[in-house]
Amino acid sequence: MDLREITDFNAPELDVYARLTENQLVNRADPDNALFIAESPLVIGRALDAGCVPVSFLMERKHVEGKAQGLLERCPPDIPVYAAPLEVLEQLTGFKLTRGMLCAMRRPKLPSVEEVCAGARRVAVLENVMNPTNIGAIFRSAAALNMDAVLLSSAGSDPLYRRAVRVSMGTVFQIPWTYFPEDAPWPEGGMALLRRLGFKTAAMALRDDSLSIDDPQLLAEQKLAIVLGTEGDGLAAGTIAHCDYTVRIPMAHGVDSLNVAAASAVAFYQLGKD
């Protein structure tokens, strides 16, 4: 273990934790050096399980020989481990750390839509979902409630943003996911790609002609893509028009909509049944 006590907040090797934005970590100009931040021992462990490559750790000093010991034993011995008391770490990062531990990791190469959909029966499609907290919650529900993959439009939030990874409890590393490619952009290109792969599409939207989510037609589909829209406006009208089904969640007490993360959990539970 290459243990390094933090003595200089301005050290360039700490930029990844203290000064680089999420967009800078993505590093689209040099994707081979793109990074993400995993937060908490559980999330870091799940990232390692998925084969993600660690670059460095930042943690409370007390965790080096405590909660982090098993994680560090799984990493090469020359991985830098930056350590300090919790108050110093929070002053450095500018946010409250969950479980006092961060790990900078290489961003994995994303698979193709065809690869993540191979053998899949149920996939979630996220159209322009912008809030990382919602992204993380949707991934957690997708992994728990029988979705086989998650597909995202390019305009949505990144599932590897620190907050999304943390809220997902590391399930972003447990369920296959990717973006629709530039040569098949969402919605028209992505919809055509899903059809070529044998999927029917179900738009989650409140329309007069919507099917109830418990309609037997939906469960009878061998391959179904469940399409969820952005916060506030929901799915674009053009997206709904291109889908095979429009589906609603029945609601009581005059409530007219659910948060996209809550709606996803209901949809995945009902439509993900075997």
Where are these regions (language model features)?
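Glycine/small-residue-rich loop that forms an oxyanion/phosphate-binding "nest" at active or ligand-binding sites
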Residues: E73-K96
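Short acidic-hydrophobic, aromatic-tinged amphipathic segments that line or gate anion-handling sites
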Residues: L3-N10, P80-P85, P176-P187
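Short, aromatic/basic amphipathic alpha-helical patches
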Residues: G66-D78, T239
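Active-site/ligand-binding-proximal alpha/beta "capping" segment
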Residues: A202-V255
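Structured adenosyl-cofactor binding patch, chiefly the S-adenosyl-L-methionine
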Residues: M101-C103, S141-L145, G156-F173, A237-D274
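RNA substrate-binding interface of SAM-dependent RNA methyltransferases
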Residues: P108-D209
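Boundary-proximal intrinsically disordered activation/regulatory segments immediately upstream
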Residues: M1-G70, G156-S157
